[in-house]
Amino acid sequence: MAFVSNGTERDADEEGFEDAYENIPVASKMDLRCALEECTLALNLFLNNKFSEALEILRPWAKESIYHALGYSTILVMQSAMTFEPQDVQMGISTMKEALQTCQRFRKRTTVVESLSNLVSKQSGDQLTEEEMHAEICYAECLLQKATLTFVQDENMINFIKGGMKIRTSYQIYKECHQLYSLAVTQGKTCSDTHHQFEGGVKLGIGAFNLMLSLLPSRVLRLLEFIGFSGNREFGLSQLREGASGNSIRAILCVLTLLFYHTYISTILGTGEANLEEAEALLEPYLKKFPNGSIILFYAARIDILKGRFEQAQETFQKCIVSQQEWKQIHHLCYWELMWCHSFQQDWLQAYRYADLLCKESKWSKATYVFQKAAILSMLPDDVVKTTGEDIVALFRQVEGLKQRIAGKSIPTEKFAVRKSRRYASDNPVKLTLPALEMVYVWNGFTIVGKRPDLTENVLVTIEKAEVALQSEKNPSEYHPDDLCLVQLLKGVCLKHLGRLLQAELCFNQVIQSEKRVKYDHYLLPFTFYELGLLYKDQGDRDKAIRYIETAKSNYKDYSLESRLHFRIHAALSSLKGSPVSTPSTPQ
């Protein structure tokens, strides 16, 4: 492994960066231009891991300037979202409420008559000052963040409805701001720097809303369209790309939104076909500007994972960890990724160590972390498990008591973990079969491991050993048919990524033929139909691919991880129906 700096040696560029911002004077007045300049300084500090210094710049004017209010509250909201501590969430909500009040003071005041007239004829840009236009954008951003925190804070239905209304209001404001910007373009009024900054805000909001809404399964989107929402993926991406290529304060936010889409959404909620070339191109200038920025390093490492460069990713995650000590939550994100990195390589002992760190330090999803730790330990020989001092059965029995609710709903992966853990509730527990590899599949990790044929072959060997063990059991348990189907699904996925499509098809069909024997893991059937559909897509049989994926969509309901599969189905069908497969793809 290459040497990773412990943080005591710093580049001259970084020291120069700190010197430049060390003695930033407090402004005596704060107009829009000055606010944007000062908030840009704060943003640069934030991206260079100087989180407290960024807050110190923003705090003095947080109740007097819309951009200071937005920046200050956004950092606190990010912090609360990562810690999940109730007091941090409450602080984030309180600060965001103050930010909304600040933005409200700068918004155009309208009478009842003016408000009614605007329903018929939207107000033009001439009716708003530049400051009022920016106040609208900042208000919409604050409203969206407050709605998100409202869901996290309390699970009651009233808060859920309030949060939904805030999101809808935010969406409507963005649409109106987009109309204002379009009008300004036609009138040739977009030359000033502040107008370009407004443009950046519009592209971020409209782009993010369109992109995220386009990801939703059609049945959900139809309902949202009824109440005024709409989402166009290509339009959303184009808006974010334009925003990312600009020089506004929100350019980096457009970049981070695109990076999150390419490196997480496309993998976990999509088919795994991420545009990593664009992700690398977007990140490159920021890696040069902030070579030790933890957020930038994190995404660089994530891209390495998705490219199958696990060893390089591990080094970059370690660099990210030592780059700053103020926000430990970024360390937790790295631990999560490192856990998967080692799992993909079947280095289960190292994977366990990172799962254990998450259990001890992070509050995000204790049920998931404890289940993950127990699942990983289950892959190790008994003598190695003893050296850790852990009790696998006791860990699985803890899971149900750690489950939490957000916005009144249980977290799907936690519900899945609880259901799987119930095998260990009885006095005579029945061991789970390949639980860590099952979780790799749940998180769509085989699309990542599949980039490395050597590792995929190793995983296949592990699966086939489990298959032989199950087939030779003399006293099979009631879970035996489910376990056999799980093994066939995992085996089929490995074979598919190795290009052995006929063998993979046999495995998937074996699961489908065993449908009536499955007692507990009913999710295996729709997921298998989905995988079979993707296999036919790889073979170039578009019609058959659509038919099998539609079967997964329409013929099954009320199974574990249903929403996650529907997101993936939506992505797969959009790809198939939007761009017909003309030639068979080359197996990777």
Swiss-Prot record:
Q: Which GO terms describe its biological process?
A: lipid metabolic process
| Transmembrane feature ranges | none
Matches recorded under SUPFAM superfamilies? TPR-like
Q: TPR repeats: which residues?
A: 294-327, 485-518, 526-559
Q: Which SMART domains match?
A: TPR
Q: Which UniProt keywords apply?
A: Lipid metabolism, Repeat, TPR repeat
Q: Which domain of life is it from?
A: Eukaryota
Protein family according to the UniProt entry: Belongs to the TTC39 family.
Q: What does this protein do?
A: May be involved in lipid metabolism.
Protein name stated in the entry: Tetratricopeptide repeat protein 39B
Identify the species of origin.
Xenopus tropicalis (Western clawed frog)
